[in-house]
Amino acid sequence: MEQEARPLVRRWEVLLLGGASGVGKTQVGYRLAHHFAVGITEVDDFQVLLERMTTPEQQPALHWRRTSPAFAQASASEIMEQSLEIGHAMRLGLEGVIASHLKEQTPLVLQRDHLYPALAAQTSYGSVTNDGRVRAVFLHEPDEQQIAANYLAREPQLGPQIKRARVSWLKSQWLKQQAERCGFPVVLARPWDTVLERLIAAVS
């Protein structure tokens, strides 16, 4: 059983906890926010909100999976590339959320799939400067079969999701490369029993 790590100094106001779908972010994200006694927001909630408030014509990237006939026939690489467009479509809104928390000095963890290193690397968010107050850490699972096993354990009623696991593995590789390019830490998702303390150390 994992022991809760001792509190370390928090030097950020907004922390982006990113990583591909199926690598284990959700389970550890809430524990990470609890450790630092800060709020946490799922970026997927913003995605659902935007999908309900827009049309496919207004935001094609957000609606592609649900409305495009091409989705069913698309390769894993094509789906991954298209999924990146979701984060790009949401970037302006996420900048506003980050700016608000920086101005109000209300610390927050933002987590989920569509957070990219370049967002945390920005020098400013509108008129609000970063000044090192926005940081990011990315959870990485290098084993495609493990991602497939995670999906099967989480959603056994759907059976093996081989193609979806491939998409997530490709995205995990892309996020790792981008994070390293921007100078943000990449933390291995396993071993699971030490992932919380390793995340805490990476962002403290």
Regions found by a protein language model. Name each.
Residues T26:
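Walker A/P-loop
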Residues L17:
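Hydrophobic anchor at the beta1->P-loop junction of P-loop NTPases
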Residues G39, R52-P107:
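Conserved nucleotide-sensing/catalytic segment adjacent to the nucleotide-binding pocket
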Residues S21:
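The conserved Walker
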Residues Q173-S204:
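NTP-dependent small-molecule kinase module
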Residues M1-V14:
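Extreme N-terminal, non-catalytic leader segments
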Residues N130-Q178:
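A glycine- and Lys/Arg-enriched "phosphate-lid" helix/loop adjacent to the NTP-binding pocket
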Residues A33-D44:
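Post-Walker A helix-loop "phosphate-sensing" segment adjacent to the P-loop in P-loop NTPases
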